[in-house]
């Protein structure tokens, strides 16, 4: 007597597929679908994801609020919400169990592909890597030819030199490319950094030759020595030797004198726009950022940022408030320096304005939208500084492209609230958006989370809470003299020297000579640490879907 309930195979044969939407869109992530998988129209990625994780439904937990928006760009950020959506749209895990014993079908699949196996080895490797993603339990079957290829590759003797030739035309065809082994590997944070250093060894035209092995003091060669806070001369500061730099003993009990951990002597060089693109290809998945070389183009996104002086739109009472803040430094700073400090406060006011649009601070997507709006304001602020506008347009481009991440991080230091471990942003008239640092606790962001937490914990609280000092420090970060391909690096040196000179004068005025010396040394160390945190931030940007990024960020990262 037949069973009252049809078998799984019978139900699958008799089931009539629902009408497909136009364009075959994945019902889970809205990516392009390839067919019906487990009863639902999905893409290949969601099919593989469901096959790997359907049995782990109770084990995977959402690190946020179980309400993450799942799109083709954000689907990798939260496995729990993605799996919940798979079940919600009707994907059936029973079909998964029914498919596993059918090894003959799998064997037949590879058998049919055997004639083209040699030509499709690369495709098969890519497919195998995708199947292995987040999978340490299932058994994987691979074609024999592919297995032999992988074994032979693993047993290959490593070459002692590179015989590659440049194909893009950047180097002469006769240029011999060789691997580069850094002398001090302590400055390299990960295997990705090592390969990145190897790949960029010959890009001398993009690095300043003086950035190979530098200590914090020699990195900022234009910074005044802390033991001499009188009679500054900018032209002397630019060429001042760092060997005479001394600080007072670190026994003074104050939060401002807390020195950061000992920094390695090698300084991570700033990345040029060309090196941004190379790093993107090496740090991100191949299917994310496999783009042709960036063509020459005009600087439209950054040029489009408003350049109307903020002073024309500020109310008079706000200018009076700024003057009242900085009047105490009259006599400490000279007239030109007072003008520069006033300008920093004026240009900083738009950054204090509430955000225009609400974004969910508990989701990764919302956090990146906040970052996009903040970056737009930060770039606008930098473009309006008088000393910045005196530079050649190419130097302005290179400084912004190389330093936008560091400016964002410094702005985050100013907005950070240590009491509840969050960044606070105002919204509307009395609204507030509080972004918890914990939102960065994500497998994709783990490296940046650790580096950022180290910076937050070692940055002096007294300095971080002093708006005058942070604005000057922020300006000094903008004018980084070791950015490659600068037309007038001496002008950038001297400009940064002015801001470091102001910084040391204010530290001495606020805290006294001894404490100022130690605080100043700590800030120079933090500049080096800032570059390391910036590298981890860039890797986060390179792992995102560029189609979802703001045009300004795409331009800054040389994605287009």
Swiss-Prot record:
Q: Which UniProt keywords apply?
A: DNA-binding, Metal-binding, Nucleus, Receptor, Transcription, Transcription regulation, Zinc, Zinc-finger
Chain intervals for the UniProt region annotation (Disordered): 1-21
| DNA-binding span(s) | 23-98
GO MF annotation: an example: RNA polymerase II cis-regulatory region sequence-specific DNA binding
Q: Residue ranges of the NR C4-type zinc fingers?
A: 26-46, 62-86
Q: What is its main location?
A: nucleus
Domain spans labelled NR LBD = 336-560
Localisation per UniProt entry: Nucleus
- GO term, biological process aspect, one: negative regulation of transcription by RNA polymerase II
One GO cellular component term, please give it. nucleus
The superkingdom of the source organism is: Eukaryota
What is the recorded function of this protein according to its Swiss-Prot or TrEMBL entry?
Orphan nuclear receptor.
Q: Which family does it belong to?
A: Belongs to the nuclear hormone receptor family.
Q: What is this protein called?
A: Nuclear hormone receptor family member nhr-8
Organism per entry:
Caenorhabditis elegans
Q: Identify the taxonomic lineage of the organism of origin.
A: Eukaryota, Metazoa, Ecdysozoa, Nematoda, Chromadorea
